Amino acid sequence: MIRRVLVANRGEIALRIVRACRDMNIDMVAVHSEADADGLWATMATRRVCIGPARAGESYLSIPNIIEAALKTGCDAVHPGFGFLSENPDFARKVAENGLIFIGPGADVMARMGDKSAARAAMTEAGVPVVPGSEGVVDSIEAA
């Protein structure tokens, strides 16, 4: 059972996740940059952790900082929210490698579905109807 979740996002996305977890009696850890310390999602969470400076590349996109925050605060799971690292298979893999639950699709699924050609092939193989289009990677403008 999940007892504590770290939300690896900010703003209204993080706020929505914080509220949902609160409704389910799950402790919530919010991460924030130095500039976002007073963000509503951070103040409403059970705990909050600063993960770096205002620049997103040094905070919200820093996989090591987010993993460290989750481990230091005793989280069971990480919710990526939307954008930032939510579709990054390396992030999902690192979360799992550190013994945490990634709330979202697995790294392998993300990697496969993130490649349109591979996703189309997987859906066709599974018998899912796909819209007409190329059967593989288009290698020239003329072919497109």
Task: Label every PLM stretch briefly.
Residues 1-144:
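N-terminal beta-alpha lobe that positions the nucleotide/phosphoryl donor
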